[in-house]
Amino acid sequence: MALNTAPTADALAAMAFPVSSPSVPTAQELDTITSGLTTLGVPTDSLLSHALALVNACFDAGSSSFVTLSGPSPTPTISLAQIAGVVKVTTTLRKFCRFYAKIIWNARLARNLPPAGFARANIKFEHRWAGFDFFDGLLNPAALEPPGGLSRTPTPDEVTANETARSLNLFEARASYSNLASTSTQFTRGQLSNTAPQVQFLPAPSD
């Protein structure tokens, strides 16, 4: 069929259009992580429980590249930091956690255990369930779907609270970023930023 020809209804129905997203790991990346965890010593029949132990820790502590995870995994001789290290060889920690967001959301809701870092993210108590940084995975159709779907759909207020917190973090990061091309103290004079502290205002809500 020529590229300038529209497909027939039957031809279109026969085509596969799988959902994909650059915000979650690909099947190939998950296979690579599986291989890495197996090499680390994670039992093949416990791969998912180890993955979810990591996601659960990030649900509370965050999934940025700077997060420090402590404590053991379900295998006492393997730490959560080691599992995170395997993941980060292939993809970002946040993308990995985002893939399992719906699973950990259901599990923590069932136990009434909201994310521990919601107050640190400046999220109000009534929106505390929005206080984890891969929350958007709940609305990503490419993320792993639990049997029966989400036990509770995020409310519009929770979505807004999480997006506001995410935007605030981005503005704070940009405010503290140095635009110097060198890290030499001859240029930086030991300062972490080359600009004076200043108030950063979020843009007005769009109509």
Curated annotation (Swiss-Prot):
Protein name (record): Coat protein
Keywords, in A-Z order: Capsid protein, Helical capsid protein, Ribonucleoprotein, Virion
Main location: virion
Gene Ontology molecular function: structural molecule activity
Family (UniProt): Belongs to the potexvirus capsid protein family.
Subcellular location: Virion
Function according to Swiss-Prot or TrEMBL: Required for genome encapsidation. Forms ribonucleoprotein complexes along with TGB1 helicase and viral RNA.
InterPro entries reported in the protein's UniProt record: Pltvir_coat
Gene Ontology CC annotation, any one: helical viral capsid
Organism: Plantago asiatica mosaic potexvirus (P1AMV)
PROSITE patterns for this protein: POTEX_CARLAVIRUS_COAT
